[in-house]
């Protein structure tokens, strides 16, 4: 019976960071500063940051959907930040739970999704990308 529950409630393994994913995994403050500087001032570019942790089951559960969104929404930039590696960046964005997805336009937070809420995240990404189109 123990194996039944572990099978039912164990999230899938995290997908590999390699491959064709458009998600930019940020592992250093210098890389974050460079990426943030390159994208923050564009008022039409949606930035989506996935604040997660390797030990977070819900983070691993939603990761394939996040990568899929990054592939489908080419007009947005998708970042993944491990809160244990870049705790200062997570603190700056007031991340208190994982996963937290922060949506940014023109350098300002426009929305946030806390938890592995794939449908809500996709709806918000779609909404803010659509609002960029003129």
UniProtKB/Swiss-Prot annotation:
List, alphabetically, the PANTHER family matched. THIOREDOXIN
Q: Does the keyword Secreted apply?
A: no
Q: Which PROSITE patterns did the record assign?
A: THIOREDOXIN_1 (PS00194), THIOREDOXIN_2 (PS51352)
Q: Which residues form the active site?
A: 56 (nucleophile), 59 (nucleophile)
Entry protein name: Thioredoxin H2-2
**Annotated site, Contributes to redox potential value, chain positions:** 57-58
What is the role of this chain? Probable thiol-disulfide oxidoreductase that may be involved in the redox regulation of a number of cytosolic enzymes.
A matching Pfam family: Thioredoxin
Site feature (Deprotonates C-terminal active site Cys) residues:
50
Protein's organism: Oryza sativa subsp. japonica (Rice)
Q: Report the domain of life of the source organism.
A: Eukaryota
The uppermost taxa in this organism's lineage are: Eukaryota, Viridiplantae, Streptophyta, Embryophyta, Tracheophyta
According to its UniProt record, which protein family does this protein belong to? Belongs to the thioredoxin family. Plant H-type subfamily.
Q: Which residues form the Thioredoxin domain?
A: 3-130
Keywords attached to this entry: Cytoplasm, Disulfide bond, Electron transport, Redox-active center, Transport
Q: Name one GO cellular component term.
A: cytoplasm
Q: Where is this region: Disordered?
A: 1-20
Q: Where, per UniProt, does this protein localize?
A: Cytoplasm
Q: List the disulfide bonds.
A: 56-59
């Amino acid at each position: 019976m123990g194996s039944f529950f572990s099978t039912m409630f164990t999230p899938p393994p995290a997908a590999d960071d390699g491959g064709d994913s458009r998600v930019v995994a940020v592992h250093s403050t210098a890389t974050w500063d460079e990426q943030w500087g390159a994208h923050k001032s564009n008022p039409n570019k949606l930035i989506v940051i996935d604040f997660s942790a390797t030990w977070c089951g819900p983070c691993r559960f939603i990761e394939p959907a996040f990568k899929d969104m990054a592939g489908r929404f080419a007009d947005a930039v998708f970042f993944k930040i491990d809160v244990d590696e870049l705790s200062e960046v997570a603190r700056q964005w007031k991340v208190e739970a994982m996963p937290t997805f922060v949506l940014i336009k023109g350098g300002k937070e426009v929305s946030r999704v806390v938890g592995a809420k794939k449908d809500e995240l996709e709806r918000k990404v779609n909404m803010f990308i659509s609002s960029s189109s003129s």
